[in-house]
């Protein structure tokens, strides 16, 4: 009995790791041009989006130029998503199973039709678990993040990913692979926490609206995990994607200053040595506007990438759990 439970937990972890990896790689490849443009715009105080697009379009191999840095970006985002979703699921499952936390209201006890099969927690629990999981994943993937940002930038003439890593180590040492981690953590942890909070709340509200509409009234028969049997996969995916877009837009707008500072530190660590100094220098030399460089690009990219990654992830998990449930029923 115990072995079966452990096997189930391992299978669940593999499901979440695989789903996170697949969703992360796909979203990274599709949205690499937007990520590259954001890096180029943020690295300079005079380059506009249209100027940057024109420069890339006029390069010898324009298509390839827009997808420069795709490999490190896909590796970072893919494995970052895999680690993040796996650790986030573990945290949320442990919180959901805690009788103490359930007693004080951290776990939602009210059952309702929902577009997701993931654990239902309070806003505070969603905020905290999202932030903790992202900070941990960010630290593990920081070296790849540094290589990705440097490789995308035109401040460095790196010809390969290996060459970029070698140059960073020789010129800055091991510490160079973690330049800007403070700014990255301060940006990513709150972003992830806010995203999960907004995302789960929006999903809950949209699921309630859809379920309460005349077209789906009376379809309230539920299965385990609070998911309606009659809520079609396409309906769930639409709710999840819409919630993801809105949640990402809100979280991105709030955390963009840290993203702008982080990019400067990672690109020019000798000029911008730490978070506070970089922020003061940017505001003093370029004004408050510099803290919101690339906001439009980042908001657009984050809205699509986060919504896409979470929708694919949730759909893969939903299908995997449905298959697993059918297999268990056949065994019984």
Curated annotation (Swiss-Prot):
Pfam families from the UniProt entry: Mito_carr
Protein name: Mitochondrial glycine transporter
Subcellular location: Mitochondrion inner membrane
Source organism (scientific name): Botryotinia fuckeliana (strain B05.10)
GO CC, one annotated term: mitochondrial inner membrane
Gene Ontology terms describing biological process: glycine import into mitochondrion; heme biosynthetic process
Function, as annotated: Mitochondrial glycine transporter that imports glycine into the mitochondrial matrix. Plays an important role in providing glycine for the first enzymatic step in heme biosynthesis, the condensation of glycine with succinyl-CoA to produce 5-aminolevulinate (ALA) in the mitochondrial matrix.
Keywords noted in UniProt: Membrane, Mitochondrion, Mitochondrion inner membrane, Repeat, Transmembrane, Transmembrane helix, Transport
UniProt repeat feature Solcar, residue ranges: 11-94, 121-205, 235-319
Highest taxon of source: Eukaryota
Membrane protein topology class: Multi-pass membrane protein
Family indicated by similarity: Belongs to the mitochondrial carrier (TC 2.A.29) family. SLC25A38 subfamily.
Reaction(s) catalysed by this chain's protein: glycine(in) = glycine(out)
GO molecular function term, any single one: glycine transmembrane transporter activity
TM region positions: 17-42, 69-95, 127-152, 180-203, 239-265, 294-312
